Amino acid sequence: MHSIKRPNRHRFLYFVRHGQYERSPEHPDGTLTELGRLQAETLATRIQDLPLDAIWASTMYRAQETAQIIADRHFPHLEVQRSVLLREKAFPCEHDAWVKALSRHRAPEDRLERIAARWFRRSNRERHELVVCHGNLIRAVVTRVLGSDVNSWLRMSTHHCGLTRVTCWDDGRVSLVTYNDVSYLPDEYISVV
């Protein structure tokens, strides 16, 4: 007797930090630098064979710009969807001041719960979703997936266009598959700040 194979209803999430950016008076959220565009184009080539069902982006311009480059290059059939949940809200200050103040900040736990409810939920079919957002948010999500102290994200680093893969199994388990993969980037394309 043959058993009936159940359909795969796993959700595969690909979290990506936006490309390198710079701020200006015209774009306080930041726009991609030439290097940031190269990082996004290289990432697009790296993931071109994924059967993506959706591309999500933070409402901040640098994340939208990164997501649009990826969509335009290899996924023109997908419209980039935006979510305010993916915004980098916890640390709006300049980087140097942020580094000095790290010990005073806490990850936004209530927002992590809303993100988990939205993206870690079970699917009625196999789904592959790209989520272009921010390093702080990705690190906080990883701590939640691992069940570690929410403030352990302060000891992690996320590179521009680093790829973090999370699998949400149909039985409710969530697993970290890779964190901050930049192995596809040439050394001269790797950046953090």
Regions found by a protein language model. Name each.
Residues 1-11, 76, 81, 91-103, ...:
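Acidic, low-complexity terminal tails and accessory targeting/binding regions
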Residues 4-82, 105:
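Active-site-proximal alpha-helix that buttresses catalytic centers in soluble enzyme cores
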Residues 13, 125-136:
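Generic beta-sheet signal
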Residues 19, 135, 182:
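Active-site metal-binding loops of divalent metal-dependent hydrolases
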Residues 60-64, 135-136, 160:
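Alpha-helix N-cap/helix-start capping motif
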Residues 69, 140, 144:
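Active-site signature of alpha/beta-hydrolase-fold catalytic machinery across serine-
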Residues 115:
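A conserved mid-domain beta-alpha-beta active-site/ligand-binding segment of alpha/beta enzyme cores
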Residues 135-139, 175:
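GST superfamily/GST-like fold recognition
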